[in-house]
């Protein structure tokens, strides 16, 4: 999605590189000596990769959380805008805990940090079924997600910072 590409460019910066091959892995971005892996899905998918990379490198995991989403309905794929509205669902920094439960073998670790940008996105969707098995009335396919802005960024490097997140500091 555009969101993935935009965040990758943001974290790589002007001096960094994107899509770097390192051994058997492809790294989303490398800035100085820092390896940056962006993950929209579950963190457990990165667990073994991070455990391997952290032996020789510092690793930053970027796990975006959608704080706010504007839904833009199109009449068809690549078509004209029909309507737009805000989704009632909102994400929060504490949503990260659901993912960390499956990531304990990789984090916390002195060479691993997690950054979770809370982002506002525009999601373009059109009528259709996509690859889902179940049909529903008013089904839609997500065409793209675009970054509007980063609202806030939460950084975790240690167990203590996890505690601060729970306490709301």
Which residues does each predicted region cover?
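Acidic-basic catalytic patches of nuclease active cores, encompassing PD-(D/E)XK
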Residues: 1-26, 102
